[in-house]
């Protein structure tokens, strides 16, 4: 996978855009570990490691943080995670994770919403 662009963000955060159209957030230290440079290549092995060791864990923590303050629908949570720059497969993994603990339940959300807005 070729790295098309590296966009600097706040607090040492980068957004890496790949030629395939994927983009993902990563910190400068992690990018240096994988020797990411514009125009450089990212091996499939490195990509799989980044997904499992960095992005999945971070997206799960982010989902829990988002749900900590108020209940949300699956759609709302998906939208928030996508706004944070996570790829769709990572977003789905994080949603499946929080659903496994019943932290996201659209039926319960709808019942609660109706109960409080009658």
Predicted regions: what they are:
Residues 1-118:
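An alpha-helical, amphipathic repeat domain used for nucleic-acid recognition
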């Amino acid at each position: 996978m070729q790295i098309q662009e590296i966009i600097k963000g706040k607090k040492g955060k980068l957004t890496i855009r790949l030629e395939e159209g994927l983009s993902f957030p990563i910190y400068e230290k992690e990018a240096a570990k994988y020797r990411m440079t514009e125009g450089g290549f990212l091996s499939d092995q490195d990509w799989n490691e980044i997904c499992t060791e960095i992005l999945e864990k971070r997206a799960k923590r982010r989902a829990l943080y988002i749900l900590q303050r108020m209940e949300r629908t699956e759609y709302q949570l998906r939208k928030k995670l996508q706004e944070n720059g996570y790829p769709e497969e990572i977003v789905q993994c994080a949603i499946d994770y929080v659903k496994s603990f019943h932290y996201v339940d659209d039926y319960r959300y709808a019942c609660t919403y109706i109960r409080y807005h009658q």
